[in-house]
Amino acid sequence: PIGLILGIMPWNFPFWQVFRFAIPTITAGNGAILKHASNVQGCAVAIESCFRESGFPRNIFRNLVIPGSDVSEVIKNSAIAAVTITGSTPAGKSVAKTAGSVLKKTVLELGGSDPYIILDDANLSLAVDSCISGRLLNAGQSCIAAKRLIVTESVYDSFLSMMVEKLSEKIMGN
């Protein structure tokens, strides 16, 4: 165990991301402090209640309701041993700068733009289905959603035709 770990978590998976940070942190013998995205504070309060009502040690998990502008002061606090952030590149740069200035252990999981690569020997039906589900997961609000398609020329027309057909079956919006 290294002590108290600050987790700065995004809004797009407000429960899953927090538990993905908190459970391993606590299991390893550390305390967890959450600074959640400001638009999902209700989720953060509910998660803190889950830990409390489940019989975890008192204060093993705490939720900070603070603006993003105050995060650097929390990182600098001597009680914080490490910080982890899942978020945007600009937020990650800010956290890295502050954490680096006081030599805190740091994990940066920052915004991605995952490519989806379709090669000549791909099972196109499977590729189209997995590409669509990957892109539409959580209404597309995911850093791991397939955002760029790289398709070899030999299968491009078939892939595109199948993709258009399958997407036309989806209901978008209200």
Which positions does each model-derived feature cover?
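ALDH superfamily catalytic-core signature
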Residues: 55, 90-174
